[in-house]
Amino acid sequence: MGELPLDINIQEPRWDQSTFLGRARHFFTVTDPRNLLLSGAQLEASRNIVQNYRAGVVTPGITEDQLWRAKYVYDSAFHPDTGEKVVLIGRMSAQVPMNMTITGCMLTFYRKTPTVVFWQWVNQSFNAIVNYSNRSGDTPITVRQLGTAYVSATTGAVATALGLKSLTKHLPPLVGRFVPFAAVAAANCINIPLMRQRELQVGIPVADEAGQRLGYSVTAAKQGIFQVVISRICMAIPAMAIPPLIMDTLEKKDFLKRRPWLGAPLQVGLVGFCLVFATPLCCALFPQKSSIHISNLEPELRAQIHEQNPSVEVVYYNKGL
């Protein structure tokens, strides 16, 4: 078997990102929880393979599939801009097991005020860790911005949960089960824009098809943040809407009435099953490398691009996650 060529572009995902299927395959790989079980030595081995290949050195005997596997293992554990190893629960591969546990508990312990407050706080604490761990190298999150977003999102989530909880007291019990979802949706609408407030102030980089940076756009930032908010809310819908319907039916049956202790693990399991599919599929709703027509950009930036490169009609930007 001959040595691998050096023209495999491991800077980009393996599958075509212009199609939903290609994006879904990419995110199923990125969010694979099995990556959490890899040892430090395995992570370092993957980092060496990737860094050597980018430097023009092919690891002897490696196949193309092994190269791509190393690339995805590397991406799952190391920050793309800083190269630092991301804390375990901040990695994309931790999304399913962590959200499974937290969401399952939010849906199980929704009746009493102290448990509502506690699990909404846990959820926003986890979100803060994920957002900080995956912060952008272009627009890094300051401690103050992180704190503001964290406190605001937690306050918004708790206020929404407690407000709706009081409003649903006289409604059918099933309605009360959806209060945690409303709280999470409200928190996402607060947390993500605040966490990325610098992008809303100075814009995010936009580039031509070849990757040549053309400037910064606040309009592109708004579009990207909106897409991320929609993705995050859609991601929560299956896990926070389907299990309550199933549990409401099961809790009326003798099986769970005789074994109430099974309620929490069963709910967590149902949430996990939904998240295994919802997380990658909702991450794939919009292309990571999104596009916007220059006619929709700010007038100054549009004029600047026309002056630099009159043939450019569409620019691209990284929408974030």
From Swiss-Prot:
It is found in: Mitochondrion membrane. GO terms for molecular function: L-serine transmembrane transporter activity; monoatomic ion transmembrane transporter activity; transmembrane transporter activity. GO terms for cellular component: mitochondrial inner membrane; mitochondrion. This is Sideroflexin-3. It comes from Homo sapiens. It catalyses: L-serine(in) = L-serine(out). It is a multi-pass membrane protein. The gene is SFXN3. Keywords: Acetylation, Amino-acid transport, Membrane, Mitochondrion, One-carbon metabolism, Transmembrane, Transmembrane helix, Transport. Signal peptide: none annotated. Disulfide bonds: none annotated. The lineage of its organism: Eukaryota, Metazoa, Chordata, Craniata, Vertebrata. The chain crosses the membrane at residues 146-164, 174-194, 226-246, 266-286.
